A protein has these predicted regions:
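N-terminal core-binding DNA-recognition domain of tyrosine recombinases/integrases
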Residues: 52-67, 76-166, 198
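Short, charged phosphate-coordinating catalytic segments
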Residues: 145-147, 215-239
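Flexible interdomain linker/hinge and immediately adjacent N-terminus
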Residues: 149-193, 296-299
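Basic, Lys/Arg- and aromatic-enriched nucleic-acid-binding interface segment
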Residues: 189-222
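Short, basic (Lys/Arg/His-rich) helix/loop patches that form interaction surfaces
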Residues: 309-348
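Catalytic-site neighborhood detector that most strongly recognizes the C-terminal catalytic loop/helix
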Residues: 350-369
């Protein structure tokens, strides 16, 4: 599908991995246990914070995805730093009045919006701010269910009654907190096949060329691609790649919805895949993952999402093309629609449970589809 010329692999210095946590009192650390990453929140004197770490363990036990647990860990570390700055504790928050609690959490939203939770005061999108606060609220709910703290007043459910035009009384349950930011409309520009080819040509190694080609050609999620085990998931006779659900991927890659499905590769991309494995047999020998880190102290470890985003950012500077894994997945869906694929086939290829999700994903209305 794409011209993925093989080139000699160049030596390059990887961008330093993003530091976990920030330079404030509380930060996130991860440890490997049973071949799975476990997240903890520790203080600046290297003490484990018991309550948030207990909650993160609970998320592991209910089989939340590693990325969900990681996201919750960072959100709670930010919130604990905010509490430290405000010199107030969890128990004191629960004693505040409704209006005081409401103000406290709105202030937290603005605090992360301004980037005070990061070392470099990097501003945060409304959607991400809301995600952080949602994680904090779920933590408070967990503590309430464990009888550690009373339920927050802003999280108590209110019942609202109203009469319709026929005089029938209805009751709806609504959450009390209304302070979430209005989320920005997604502004993800479409990417063209020419731009994808330009990105591939700008890559400095065969791994990145193959990764971009596969994302655009299969419609697989980034986590699904990074979770591919070349020893188990590739059918060399049928030219297919299988998505498998695994909990133990050390790079946090996981198939969403615990699903299994296959993606067919074009002749060109499959030939490149085979040659990539053959040429990199030595470096792949100690790993079962198709995509691994190429240089540095972590050489040979499974490639993770942060490294992919860093790679796309470098390519953006070289080509002036802003790209994103989701953008490449959306490209796949749009191309299949143009080719006349049935909507259910597109749904299955994308791994959506409901066709309504696919319709929304394509940004189309029922009539046109």
């Amino acid at each position: 599908m794409y011209n993925v010329e093989l080139r000699s692999q160049r030596s390059q210095t990887n961008q330093k991995e993003r530091k976990e946590g920030c330079g404030l009192k509380y930060r996130v650390v991860s440890v490997l246990k049973d071949n799975r990453p476990r997240f903890l929140i520790i203080s600046d004197i290297e003490e484990i914070e018991i309550l948030p770490s207990k909650y993160l363990k609970h998320l592991d036990q209910i089989n939340a995805s590693p990325n969900t647990v990681k996201s919750a860990a960072f959100a709670l570390s930010y919130y604990y730093n905010y509490l430290q700055e405000q010199t107030i504790g969890l128990d004191e928050i629960t004693l505040l009045s409704y209006s005081e609690q409401n103000k406290h959490f709105i202030d937290f939203l603005y605090w992360v919006k301004s980037g005070k939770h990061t070392e470099h005061n990097t501003q945060t999108s409304n959607k991400t701010c809301n995600m952080y606060l949602g994680a904090v609220f779920r933590y408070y709910q967990f503590l309430a269910l464990e009888d550690v703290l009373p339920m927050l007043k802003v999280l108590r459910v209110k019942k609202v009654s109203y009469f319709d035009s026929m005089g029938v009384n209805h009751q709806n349950a609504v959450n009390s907190f209304k302070g979430f930011f209005k989320e920005e409309e997604p502004n993800l520009e479409e990417i063209t096949s020419e731009e994808i080819q330009e990105l591939i040509n700008a890559c400095t190694n065969d791994r990145d060329r193959l990764l971009i080609a596969m994302m655009a050609e299969t419609g697989l999620r980034l986590g699904e691609i990074l979770g591919i085990h070349y020893t188990e998931d590739i059918d060399f006779e049928r030219r297919t790649v299988r998505v498998r659900y695994r909990e133990s991927n050390t790079n946090l890659a996981r198939a969403k919805n615990a699903e299994y499905r296959m993606a067919l590769l074009s002749n060109t991309t499959f030939e490149f895949l085979v040659k990539y494995i053959s040429d990199n047999r030595k470096s792949l020998m100690n790993s079962e993952y198709l995509f691994t880190k190429l240089t540095g102290k972590n050489k040979g470890e499974p490639l993770d999402a942060d490294s992919v985003y860093s790679m796309l950012k470098r390519l953006s500077k070289k080509t002036d093309i802003n790209s994103h894994p989701h953008q490449l997945r959306h490209y796949f869906a749009e191309e299949r629609r143009k080719e006349g694929w049935d909507l259910n086939d597109i749904r299955f290829a994308l791994g959506h449970k409901k066709v309504e999700t696919t319709i929304k994903y394509l940004g189309e209305n029922n009539e046109r589809l």
